[in-house]
Amino acid sequence: MEKNLTTGSVFGNIVRFSLPYLFSYFLQTLYGMADLFIIGQYADASGTTAVSVGSQVMHMLTLMIVGLAMGATVTIGQAVGARDQKSAARYTGNTMSLFLVLSVAVTGLLLALVRPIAAVMSTPAEAVSGTVAYLRICFLGVPLITEYNIIASVFRGLGDSKRPMYFIAVACAVNIALDYLFIGALHMGPAGAALGTTLAQAVSVAVSLAVMRSARGGIALTRDDFRPQRAIMGRILRIGVPIALQDGLIQIAFLFITVIANRRGLTDAAAVGIVEKIISFLFLVPSSMLSTVSALGAQCIGAGKSRRALQTLWYAIAVAFGFGVLISVVIQFVAEPVVALFTHDAAVVAAGGPYLRGYILDCCFAGVHFCFSGYFCAIGRSELSFVHNITAVVLVRVPGAYLTSRYFPATLLPMGLATAAGSLLSVIICVIAFLVLRRHGKLLPGEG
């Protein structure tokens, strides 16, 4: 189960680690789309809206859990790189204990706030009951979502990105089968979609726990490893909390941008919604690079091979930026046909094309700052990732979207460029932070 990523070809390790991670992200996207697709076949518009709104809430929550789990990936990765099995076991056990308590507490809070959450999301009156039913069941499954992501973070910290891919594949297959049972055969509507999702997570967690217990070459856990230790939990949270807050606030920012688009009318709102889905799919590559740099970089830092960690960063930036440039050039010629894959409305296609042409440049800049974020996490400075992302959101993304929407009512192109400009600011901040760290000798704590 444990894989040493501190030797061999740096580029080869990046490819071998990132491809399963990339496919995992793809499966998670498919997982989320399955509920909407299937309920759209069997329910009315209110049922589809309920699942759509509920899915947005759960997506935001899941991203925050994944961000928080980054602390486990990095700390375990550093321990593995240092060949310190005892520390790796303690970080693993404390992570599981910490997140078990947090998930139960969060579940209780969310269940108490389910109706206010539906109201904050501006859920249409016809879909409120379905949204509440969907969220209640999904909230009961929060401990399962947390458990899956923690187990996945442990495996990735050990250098294994394949097994988490298998676990999400199991969940995806079970979810689709249960959706057809609960929504199609039993006509349970949004509640059926939520029940299918929750039970699929339960199956995935059961499989992942069985694999973790039987896998050879993994971490041997004892009862003492699960005993809370303030220093260990503090280090996990110091890395994970900034990422979780960052991901949550970014999702809130995107909700603001959605509101801004909605005020432009139905056509522009539909165009923005479609382009957001296209971009989220294309961003799978930068996202996989972030996770790859954090996991591989953490092992290299733990092994005292800081120069190799830097090589991992540069190779990942080359891959992510190269992908961004390629896809940006292609989209300039095929923007409208790509948007047309999701709608037959000519007006929506005409509005979405320019927006996609501007927004796609974000793939270039985001690919760079995602890699820097992964590196900052690997060296235990995740607060830098938080700072550059939130600064870009507050100073450029949201105000830029508002101002361009107001002063350019005839086209969405400037609104798309404003989003890319936010990522450009993030790149500038990342480069400055990197140079400052290098000047103060904070990038090379060890040599190898």
Say what each PLM segment does:
Residues M1-S18, I76-G141, A185-V241, G297-D362, ...:
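Short alpha-helical transmembrane segments in multi-pass integral membrane proteins
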Residues T7, F11-L30, A34, V57-M64, ...:
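Residue-level signal for short hydrophobic patches within transmembrane helices
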Residues L30-T49, A118-A125, L181-M188, G248-F281, ...:
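Helix-terminus/linker motif at the lipid-water interface of multi-pass membrane proteins
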Residues C138-R156, P164-C172, A193-S208, S287-L290, ...:
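Short runs within selected transmembrane alpha-helices of multi-pass transporters and secretion channels
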Residues R16-D35, I137, A171, A200-S204, ...:
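Transmembrane helical elements of multi-pass membrane transporters/channels
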